[in-house]
UniProtKB/Swiss-Prot annotation:
GO terms for cellular component: cytoplasm. It comes from Clostridium botulinum (strain Alaska E43 / Type E3). Residues 1-61 form the TGS domain. The keyword Zinc applies. It is an enzyme of class 6 (ligase). Its cofactor is Zn(2+). This is Threonine--tRNA ligase. SUPFAM superfamilies: Class II aaRS ABD-related, Class II aaRS and biotin synthetases, TGS-like, ThrRS/AlaRS common domain. One of its GO terms (molecular function) is metal ion binding. Keywords: Aminoacyl-tRNA synthetase, ATP-binding, Cytoplasm, Ligase, Metal-binding, Nucleotide-binding, Protein biosynthesis, RNA-binding, tRNA-binding, Zinc. Coiled coil: none annotated.
Length: 643
């Protein structure tokens, strides 16, 4: 008999060799009917999996995230099945579930057309209606390679697997695919699916590899859920920062400038400047000192820091090591520069903590397939910072960093959109990370203890750390469901040693400090993208590039309009006036489309009484208000950063 610890805390005994499904059925027939997959010892698995030892087990139903992922993963295989039926010469790559659905990558001579997607969707529905059996089986490596001999991408994936790894397959009807699972027991419960679009994607995300065709889609148990999703997709398209940011003249791009190099237009630049001044002032209030460091450095500096060994492919290198006496590189991070500043003078324990802050322009050689609008770029501006602390100060300073980030998030109104990820190293990937298992384990244990003390609700993720230490990443999803890191806090165990950083403790002994890397508001470009999508371009007044627009009803009142502009501009308000000889209704509509928080209409009555007729985004037409009263209200709204 084996012991199975269930999610409710109970422990039950079962015969060894039962499947997860059989265990679910023994607990409840209803649970078995609704079961989609399981989680055994923290790892998602198939209901078909056999249990042969003591384990912890959670049964995941269709409405759980794990269940939704299993449904969509299964339907990605149905898509591949349909492709093989209709386009049998197509070669298969990979087909995972993603946050809002699934995709599958194909190698096909001619890209799929919109009509092809319609045919494939119809064929998928036909396959589901056939209700084919779904089987899982495993094969030794040689038999697996033989089975997949006509699928070059599958052969490559099999060869990438370690010698001891299990090679498993799923067979849906007459279609077999290499896959670790999990998959649903039957396609019958899946009542709604949609293929949403196709796009290009490099094999394994590497632009040196062949460009494949990626088909995206989604699936649900109910048509009503699909309808809701499709409505959300339409709303997401309206909010997409790539579309809206251009419409609102916040940024643009140009192929002559280059991919991943967005140009912030005056309005976008004003938002970033407002954020930057706010962050720098807030950091100064919290004891940060400002640095200003070069945009590039000799390769020698990056060799000390480890970037040359672990991050060189992500850097823009100026020169040739074999030909040039000196080789430079644009900086991907600020840390080695601020450490050099620290080493410019001796430090006592009384000097610590030192909190360095800098608004840094950084450069990273992102692959063309990774770049997206303002979210993934090759040049960006980071609210960077490094705290040099004693071991005793580490937890309190880490807490202080989090409090700063949480204050900024709450003010921006994005605190409820954030999730926390504890990013750890992969001990098998020594090319990516500094290879010091003892230091990694100690530092990760330290960070985990701090996070638990602070009661942070986080998930753990392997192979997501920085090369020099673990991270707490604050993750935010864009309108399309893709998750990106917005802010990060890292504990560095390596670079103090590499840069020979030290302080003199109270006993007069030389000690190594701890280092906390952090970004208080992240990359300004990425944060701007998230804010565009969060507010659909209708930013809070304090953040809006134009806070007030004055509209005279005719040119007779231009002088009064100009006096209103001067009065408010002298008080720091970002204000414009529209003096065009257009109908007032047209000018109001235009100002609304620009998401202007306040529109002030002025005519004879307003000029005579020193008033403005206010139209606000929140309350629409508010009527005439004394200019002084409106000014007081507006300045208070800006000062308090009201949303």
């Amino acid at each position: 008999m084996i012991k199975v610890s269930l999610k409710d805390g109970s422990v039950k005994e079962f015969e060894a060799g039962l499947s997860v499904y059989e265990i679910a059925k023994s607990i409840s027939e209803g649970l078995a009917r609704n079961a989609c997959c399981g989680v055994v010892n923290g790892k998602v698995c198939d209901l078909r999996n056999k249990i042969n030892e003591d384990v912890s087990l959670s049964i995941c139903t269709f409405d759980s995230q794990e269940g939704k992922d299993a449904v969509r993963h299964s339907i990605s295989h149905v898509l591949a099945y349909a492709v093989k039926r209709l386009f049998p010469q197509t070669k298969l790559a990979i087909g995972p579930s993603i946050a809002t659905g699934f995709y599958y990558d194909f190698d096909k001579d001619v890209a799929f057309s919109a009509q092809d997607l319609e045919k494939l969707e119809a064929e998928m529905k036909k396959i589901i209606k056939e209700n084919p059996s779904i089987e899982k089986f495993e094969l030794p490596r040689d038999e697996a390679l033989e089975l997949m001999k006509d699928e070059p991408y599958k052969v490559e994936l099999i060869n990438d697997l370690g010698e001891d790894e299990i090679i498993s397959f799923y067979k849906i009807g007459e279609f077999t695919d290499l896959c670790a699972g999990p998959h649903v027991m039957s396609l019958k419960p899946i009542k709604a699916l949609k293929l949403t679009r196709s796009a290009g994607a490099y094999w394994k995300g590497d632009e040196k590899n062949k460009m494949l065709t990626r088909i995206y889609g989604t699936a649900f148990l109910k048509k009503s859920e699909l309808d809701e999703y499709l409505e959300a997709i339409e709303e997401a398209k309206k909010r997409d920062h790539n579309k809206l940011g251009r419409e609102l003249k916040l940024f643009t791009t140009d192929e002559n400038v280059g991919q991943g190099l967005p140009l912030l237009m005056p309005k976008g630049a004003k938002i970033v400047q407002t954020l930057q001044r706010w962050v720098e002032d807030e950091e100064e209030r919290r004891g940060y000192v400002l640095t200003k460091t070069p945009l590039m450095a000799k390769s020698d500096l990056y060799k000390i820091s480890g970037h040359w060994d672990h991050y060189k492919d992500g850097m823009f290198v100026l020169g040739d090591e074999e030909k040039d006496e000196e080789v430079f590189a644009l900086r991907p991070m600020t840390c080695p520069f601020q450490y050099t500043i620290y080493n410019a003078e001796q430090h006592s324990y009384r000097d610590l903590p030192i909190r360095y802050g800098e608004t840094s322009t950084l450069f990273r050689n992102e692959s063309s397939g990774e770049m997206h609008g303002l979210i993934r770029v090759r040049q960006f501006t980071l609210a960077d910072g490094h705290l040099i602390v004693t071991p005793e100060q580490l937890e309190e300073e880490f807490k202080g960093v989090l409090e700063l980030i949480q204050y900024l998030m709450k003010t921006l109104g994005i605190d409820e959109d954030i999730s926390y990820r504890f990013s750890k190293w992969d001990p098998n990937n020594t090319e990516k990370y500094i290879n010091d298992p003892e230091a990694w384990n100690k530092t990760q244990d330290t960070m985990r203890t701090i996070l638990d003390h602070l009661k942070i609700n986080y998930v753990e993720a392997d192979d997501e750390a920085a090369f020099y230490g673990p991270k707490l990443d604050l993750q935010c999803r864009n309108v399309h469901g893709k998750e990106d890191t917005l802010f990060t806090v890292q504990i560095d165990f390596a670079l103090a040693e590499r840069f020979d950083m030290s302080y003199i403790d109270k006993n007069g002994e030389k000690k190594r400090p701890y280092i906390i890397h952090r970004s208080s508001i992240g990359c300004y470009e990425r944060t701007l993208a998230m804010l565009i999508e969060k507010y659909a371009g209708a930013f809070p007044t304090w953040l809006s590039p134009v806070q007030v627009k004055v509209l005279p009803i005719s040119d007779k009142y231009n002088d009064y309009a100009e006096s209103v502009v001067k009065s408010l501009r002298n008080k720091g308000v970002r204000i414009e006036a529209d003096y065009r000889a257009e109908k007032i209704g047209y000018k109001i509509r235009e100002a609304r489309l620009e998401r202007t928080p306040y529109i002030l209409v002025v005519g004879e009555k307003e000029a005579a009484n020193n008033e403005v007729s206010v139209r606000s985004r929140k309350n629409d037409d508010e009527g005439a208000i004394k200019l002084d009263a409106f000014t007081e209200r507006l300045l208070n709204e800006i000062a308090t950063k009201e949303r």
